Design a protein with these regions (language model features):
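Short amphipathic alpha-helical coupling elements at transmembrane boundaries
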Residues: 1, 39, 208-211, 241-245, ...
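Short, amphipathic, aromatic/basic-enriched membrane-interface segments that mark the entry/exit
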Residues: 1-3, 58, 148-162, 286-290, ...
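Hydrophobic alpha-helical transmembrane segments
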Residues: 4-12, 66-67, 102, 106, ...
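Small-residue faces within membrane-embedded alpha-helices
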Residues: 11, 15, 68-74, 113, ...
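Membrane-interfacial helix-loop connectors
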Residues: 14-68, 85-106, 228-330
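Juxtamembrane non-transmembrane "cap" segments at the membrane-aqueous interface
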Residues: 80, 133-138, 310-318
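Hydrophobic transmembrane alpha-helices of multi-pass small-molecule transporters
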Residues: 104-238, 340-360
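Interfacial loop-to-transmembrane junctions
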Residues: 323-347
């Protein structure tokens, strides 16, 4: 019944799931949920049960919730080795396992998480940056009635499937936390077990799940080309040389800011890749110590993950949302995403910078 509480729950649940699954996967789940909500109201509009004005109200409400969820994936994604693709690369180069990565990032990620949650409450409370759209009780009841109908029609087999998914979800958390196997092996184990226990034995039954990500994949290929050019022309090298020439204490915040600025424009995975390779070279050539290398790795991870919520270019999850089938349905454009992400961008970037300066 409370929009503020609902928004907060979406941010917290998206953050928690992203820490163990991957921000992109969680965004895909959120999109599926929102498409389901959208169709409930689209059918009501078709049957003249709600007015066009009410339908527009619902769309604005869904945009709010979706943006909170998307930012939540970034807040959780920065915390762990599996949250974002570049985290794996950073952990691999630094030689960190799941729990060590979490502990090293915690001085920055935990205060940022709290700041993000406070930001969520404030922008909803004061209805700034086009947030604060409400849903009437009448419209809310339509979701409840639909949920009850789906529950009533759920078969015993479907209930068993849900239990299996829950058990495998717990297996995932324990396997990652205890580092029982490399991350990719754990993922394969889950895919095989899920499909086997749910009786999915044909490729055609899985094919539809991949269609949603095709536009996103096409954009990724373009990004790969851009980064290949950046790497080949050594376009980042002058920036890195300037940063490494500064004092030891200044290197960490400067790396954070440089990574953040570039991650807003280009994809954060590629920015992290280029910068990590450069500091590995610096370590091998004895330009920096191992201790300084670890500090810079934290700055690169937080720098690429936090300020990059500013635009869909930077965060893979945001880009996936923008290219999904949901975005045109609820009227979520590139500029709208940038505008609605702005309060989060400012808060996360500044709190992250303060933590990097004082705690790393």
């Amino acid at each position: 019944k409370s929009k503020v509480l609902l928004s907060l729950l979406f941010v917290i649940s998206a953050a928690f799931l992203s820490a163990f699954l991957d921000a992109l996967t969680v965004t895909a789940v959120l999109i599926t949920v929102m498409v389901g909500f959208y169709h409930v109201f689209a059918n009501s509009l078709k049957n003249n049960e709600i007015t066009t004005k009410e339908f527009e109200q619902v769309k604005s409400f869904l945009v709010d919730i979706m943006m909170h969820g998307a930012v939540g994936t970034a807040l959780g994604g920065v915390c762990t080795i599996v949250g974002e693709p570049q985290n794996l690369l950073i952990a691999d180069k630094a030689g960190w396992e799941f729990m060590e990565f979490f502990y090293r990032m915690a001085p920055v990620t935990m205060p940022v998480l709290v700041a993000g949650l406070i930001c969520c409450v404030l922008i909803e409370k004061f209805k700034v940056f086009d947030y604060g759209h409400q849903m009437s009780d009448e419209l809310r009841n339509k979701i409840i009635i639909n949920a009850e109908k789906v529950d009533a029609n759920r078969t015993e087999m479907e209930k068993i499937h849900l239990v299996m998914e829950g058990i495998l979800g717990l297996c995932l958390i324990f396997a990652l936390g205890l580092h029982l196997a490399p991350v990719g092996i754990i993922g394969l184990f889950l895919m095989v077990f899920l499909t086997a226990f749910k009786g999915i034995t044909e490729e055609h039954q899985l094919g539809g799940a991949f269609e949603e990500s095709l536009p996103f994949t096409a954009l990724l290929v373009i990004f790969f080309v851009v980064v290949a050019v950046i790497n080949d022309q050594s376009l980042f090298t002058p920036v890195i040389n300037v940063v490494l020439a500064s004092s030891l204490d200044m290197q960490v915040p400067l790396f954070y800011l440089a990574n953040g600025a570039l991650s807003v424009i280009s994809d954060n995975v590629f920015v992290a890749t280029v910068y990590m390779n450069e500091i590995v070279l610096a370590l091998e050539n004895n330009v920096i110590t191992k201790e300084q290398f670890d500090r810079l790795a934290v700055a690169i991870n937080t720098g690429t993950n936090l300020p990059s919520v500013a635009t869909p270019n930077g965060q893979a999850a945001f880009l996936f949302l923008l290219t999904s089938s949901l975005a045109p349905l609820i009227g979520l454009s590139y500029l709208k995403m940038v505008y609605k992400a702005l309060p989060y961008t400012i808060v996360l970037t500044l709190v992250g910078l303060a933590c990097v300066i004082y705690f790393i």
